[in-house]
A protein has these predicted regions:
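A compositional/structural signature for long, glycine/proline-rich flexible linkers
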Residues: 1-121
Length: 121
C-alpha cells in the first residue's frame, strides 16, 4: 500500500473500520475452549484486552515519534505485560537507529540502571 492509498483509507474511514474489526477479532482468545467461561474471568479477560489496547495506543500513537523521543512507563501495575519484575521501573521510548541520542538525568538512589535496545516491533 502506497502513501496515497493510506491517506485515502484514512479519509474514507476504512482505517477506522479495520481497527474496529481487529478489536472484535481480539476477543476470540476469551472464547477458546481452554478459556474459563464464567462471568468473572470473562470480565477480567475484557479488562486485560482493554489495558493491552491502551498500552498499544500509548506505544504506537502517543509515544511513537523518534524525532522527539520521551520516556514513558509502558509496563506498570495497571498494565501488566507478563514478565515484568515488580522491583523494577521500566521506561520505554521510540528511537531511530540512524539517529544519535543523548540521555541526561540523575540516577538518584538506584543501584542499577540498565539500558537495552531492540530492533523492530
Amino acid at each position: 500500500m502506497d502513501e496515497h492509498e493510506s491517506l485515502e483509507r484514512i479519509l474514507d474511514g476504512r482505517t477506522w473500520d479495520d481497527f474496529c474489526d481487529s478489536l472484535k477479532d481480539a476477543r476470540t482468545a476469551l472464547f477458546r475452549e481452554s478459556s474459563p467461561a464464567n462471568a468473572f474471568d470473562r470480565a477480567e479477560g475484557y479488562r486485560h484486552l482493554s489495558r493491552l489496547l491502551r498500552v498499544a495506543l500509548e506505544r504506537f500513537v502517543e509515544h511513537a515519534d523518534p524525532e522527539h523521543p520521551r520516556f514513558y512507563q509502558m509496563a506498570r501495575a495497571d498494565a501488566k505485560l507478563g514478565a515484568d519484575n515488580p522491583d523494577c521501573c521500566y521506561r520505554n521510548c521510540a528511537l531511530d537507529g540512524r539517529r544519535e541520542y543523548r540521555i541526561r538525568g540523575q540516577r538518584g538512589t538506584s543501584t542499577y540502571l540498565g539500558i537495552g535496545t531492540y530492533y523492530g516491533h
